[in-house]
């Protein structure tokens, strides 16, 4: 009688365990390296022709309104509308240092955080003339 040994299952389990323990500390270290974010609050409204934004905290501007075609992004920072290749080098310690793009989509708004946000991308449904508040950490309900 021959005994056939099956090592494929234990080897697979060992490989998964090594992979888990090898990547775990790297992922934890990455999460703990988030920079200190300064607070900002902005209310975003989708209009028939574009986007309206009202800053409640952390920026030099109070109201922004601009026309956008669907899927054409507009960069916004603490000083207002900007271009990604022409971001202001002036840094005011009394303002939040943020930069993101806002894009009007068929069903809502898409935001991409470039600087000064904990979020990389926010995407949400927004009907015409409906409002949504955001801050450095993401979407908020109270403002």
Regions found by a protein language model. Give the residues of each.
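Bacterial Sec-dependent N-terminal signal peptides
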Residues: 1-32
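Sec-dependent signal peptide cleavage junction
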Residues: 25-52, 136-143
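Mature extracytoplasmic or organellar-lumen-exposed domains after removal of signal/transit peptides
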Residues: 98-100, 107-109
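Sterically constrained small-residue positions within well-ordered secondary structures
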Residues: 20, 33-35, 44, 91-93, ...
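A low-complexity, Ser/Thr/Gly/Pro-enriched, surface-exposed linker/loop concept
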Residues: 30-33, 64-98, 127-143
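A mature extracytoplasmic/lumenal domain signature
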Residues: 46-48, 55-59, 66-72, 80, ...
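Short amphipathic alpha-helical "recognition" segments used for binding
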Residues: 6-8, 49-50, 108, 132-134
């Amino acid at each position: 009688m021959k005994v056939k040994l099956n090592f494929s299952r234990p080897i697979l389990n060992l490989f998964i365990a090594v992979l888990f323990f090898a990547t775990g500390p790297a992922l934890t270290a990455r999460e703990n390296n988030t920079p200190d974010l300064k607070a900002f609050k902005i209310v975003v409204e989708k209009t028939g022709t574009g986007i309206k934004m009202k800053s409640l905290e952390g920026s030099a501007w109070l109201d922004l309104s601009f026309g956008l075609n669907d899927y054409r992004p507009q960069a916004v920072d603490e000083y207002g509308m900007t271009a990604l290749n022409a971001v202001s080098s002036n840094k005011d310690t009394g303002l939040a240092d943020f930069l993101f793009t806002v894009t009007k989509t068929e069903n809502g708004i898409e935001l991409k955080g470039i600087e000064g946000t904990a979020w990389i991308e926010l995407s949400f449904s927004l009907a015409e003339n409906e409002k949504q508040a955001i801050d450095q950490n993401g979407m908020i309900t109270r403002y």
